[in-house]
């Protein structure tokens, strides 16, 4: 019997574009900062926390001396015990609330870079060393403010969670000083790119699922996974942000209350009885958009979108999906399963063959092995040359090398990277369409005395996994 915990109250939702593949101008016009569900909420039972919470005018009213934080050096793939507590002295002093410091004494405010229902985001520069940060200003009076600060403290230290550097408290608001992700938002990149190659999508998606899995292990449900809340660093790596709707959850508990963004919300949220698997559904919607360029569930109104989420059957066999590999479609089908108990977990997503095949580790292994072959071939040729010829060749080789002191973006190696991604995608689709008879399949999948080395599947646990996946 699962214990049920109600969410705070029906939260704000954002209106998202239905089609990510149309022109940039029309796509931009589809965005609105926030789309309120207050009218819709009146038709629903207004939910409140079952836990007794004192007045939220200041963090000083809460239990002093205790806060939450992750275990030091915890791996995202190793269970952490869900929500370990530590003394507040173990948390960075600058991120503790109730300090007397004034933000104007430490930072200079710059331009506004974002605005939402609960506050605004501005660039701020450190007076001490000139480093730029993002400052999120949140008005007091909403419990989401206190919860967001606590959860960011709880999750701090993970490389894919936006780092909280300092918290300043004033009479009417909190200032959260966080790392500045200069690469912008993932949604803006999606609008420009349209459809992503499977290789590129898989590497973005794996990083996202790693941080979602970490949140779930730490007893946190984000409840608002969408590309607007995924930021990019200068190197193109993702950072999960905006924990305003996030909730703490114990193992076996369920949540209630509407929260999230309409196009990404899981069907069980509409029934107001859900668990951390709502994040898996939302991530599945994002993966669908990355691979197809459009959102799966659309409508002219909230009710129409919700009706599509509850009833529309997704077709992964026609249109753009004919050029997408079967493993990718299989993963999507498992993530966008309406039956929550049948939906895979974040950890299972990370172990799916499609993720294992396309991630950096697998592809780097392919490159290293091919490089070793080419180096072996060139060394054989050098052995047959005179010492003078070897010296000339080595000098010429050194002169050809270009210094790589300029910063590179893993998502901006443009044509060459995209060409390689396209080749891999074509090969995967071709392999997926191969039909192997059962006798041949048993011979291919069964171990032999002289197994063939599979350079492209070093991340897979067995050859049988490869046969089932492709």
Swiss-Prot record:
Has the keyword ATP-binding been applied to this entry?
Answer: yes
User: InterPro entries, alphabetically?
Assistant: CDPK_Ser/Thr_kinases (IPR050205), Kinase-like_dom_sf (IPR011009), Prot_kinase_dom (IPR000719), Protein_kinase_ATP_BS (IPR017441), Ser/Thr_kinase_AS (IPR008271)
Q: Where is the composition biased (Polar residues)?
A: 377-386, 445-464
Q: Where is the composition biased (Basic and acidic residues)?
A: 387-403
Record: residues binding ATP: 113-121, 136
Q: Which CDD domains match?
A: STKc_CAMK
- The disulfide bonds in this chain are none
One Pfam family in the UniProt entry = Pkinase
Using the UniProt annotation, give all residue ranges assigned to the region (Disordered): 377-419, 441-464
Q: Which residues form the Protein kinase domain?
A: 107-355
Q: What is its EC number?
A: 2.7.11.-
UniProt entry keywords in alphabetical sequence: ATP-binding, Kinase, Nucleotide-binding, Serine/threonine-protein kinase, Transferase
Give the molecular function GO annotations.
Answer: ATP binding; protein serine kinase activity; protein serine/threonine kinase activity
Catalytic center residues: 224 (proton acceptor)
The record lists the catalysed reaction(s) as: L-seryl-[protein] + ATP = O-phospho-L-seryl-[protein] + ADP + H(+); L-threonyl-[protein] + ATP = O-phospho-L-threonyl-[protein] + ADP + H(+)
Record family assignment: Belongs to the protein kinase superfamily. Ser/Thr protein kinase family.
Protein name from the UniProt record: Serine/threonine-protein kinase PEPKR2
Q: Which gene encodes it?
A: PEPKR2
